[in-house]
Curated annotation (Swiss-Prot):
It comes from Varecia variegata (Black-and-white ruffed lemur). This is Hemoglobin subunit alpha-1. Pfam families: Globin. The keyword Nucleotide-binding does not apply. Belongs to the globin family. Heterotetramer of two alpha chains and two beta chains. GO terms for biological process: hydrogen peroxide catabolic process.
Amino acid sequence: VLSPADKNNVKSAWNAIGSHAGEHGAEALERMFLSFPPTKTYFPHFDLSHGSAQIKTHGKKVADALTNAVNHIDDMPGALSALSDLHAHKLRVDPVNFKLLSHCLLVTLASHHPAEFTPAVHASLDKFFAAVSTVLTSKYR
């Protein structure tokens, strides 16, 4: 459960990320594909080379979904319902992949925003990404 302090930390961090969210999303995807090669199996139709347009486009989709979650932090299940349906019923993404991407997002954000990435912000973002992952996997049951 995100505390009021966690919610403030997440919102502040996301504001600091600002217009770079899409770039960071793409970098996190690349990082995930390189660090966890089995995750590539969900993207057989993508050009997975560094800087590909498809990775950039999907990175922006990831970032936009996270921005939506931040903007609806008190109702993430409602805000992410359609995305949860998509990943559970159509794409059938293994839930462990959300944890892997969350880790790669944390690493990417920490590398680009070291001043903002305090231990408290790190913990809050980790809890936030876990909450988003829980929502996205909620319809698997």
